[in-house]
Amino acid sequence: MPMFSPPMQGGLPVRALEWVRLRAAQLRNDRGAIVWMAIVAALYCGATFVRSQASDWGPDHMMILATDIAQGRVDLSSLTTINDIVTIDGRHYQAMSLLPTVPYLPLVPFEFLWPFSRWVVSAAIGISAGWLALPVARRYGPGGSATWWLASLGAFGTLLFTLTIEGNFYYLAHLEAVLLTFLLLIEWHDRRRAWLIALLIGLAALARPTLILVAVPFGLALLAESKDRVRTAVALAVPLLGAIAVTAAWDFVRFGSPTETGYGIAWIEAPLARLRDQGLFSLVHVPNNVALFLGGGFTVRETFPWLEPSSLGHSILLTTPAVLIAFAASLRDRLNQILWASVILTAIPVFLFYGGGGAATYGYRYEMDFVPFLFALVAIALKDRFGNLEKILIGLSVVFVVYGYVWQVYK
């Protein structure tokens, strides 16, 4: 393929088609990537199929909402759950961000897909995110065999795998956020286009609102290195403000206020309601959340599988201990400072939130807001050292996550 391609003629569809053609040509020459994509797709699809056989089938909550939206309404015509539901004037609304509903919209005309839409959508988003673990590893890691260890960590050693196979609309927001954050990391390494950086952050925030905070370190870094700061500021502001406007409009049409997310007024189970009464976000929740995140463990039961994780969430050290490698990344490097700032800023609302690690979830699922940044830091740290200890931590991460899969199927 020539190093420089001729200018593309025509409108946006023609340019998009040409972009796809060029990327397909690059992929054909990358056998490693093709094999990686096949492995991820096969293992994710196989695990999803097995998990689906151990679950009840029926109408999918987000599929119902997508069909209702296609008919011009934003309330739910029928309910599969009463959790996180806001009832106003006899109408029922799901207290949730917008983006998890969007992948269901293309399936609305195909009624035969509705019963298993949750498996299809989650698998498609999760597999795409798993594929991107390889290009992120290639860009941030030391290369060589470490690339494949890192890619395996990203796709099979984090909660990305266990959240994907559940086919749960709550988890879909995390899958979308990981996918978009990986794209953000790739764009940051490659071209650093301010408008695209902001667009990816804005879209990620439409899945997980906490991620809007990473606009601060990434935006400041772009402004610091820009020769035209006004233009860069505008390029950053437009997509971010657009995402905020979409969120505000979505809240307004459902709850009558652009600042009402619904989480503070939705019906939830009594134990969670008591926690929420202390504050949707509050310092009161921090000690318990941090204790779960760092120290939550397993209990032993008499039947297989014998190790039972807490339904409130358990330690990241018992799901993805390889994140410890990230602490070896030097804080003197500008990139590492941006990544650590992103980790800290997204972790703050996670630990202030009343919901713990995410009810009835293997691991601490809210950690997935910042795990992609830790993943990049792990890759960077491996440039200085990639020995037996690092391999053991990555291997343990995969083992713990695979156990999570076993638990979800046989619990």
Explain the meaning of each model-derived region:
Residues 1-411:
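Membrane-proximal envelope and lipid/glycan-remodeling enzymes
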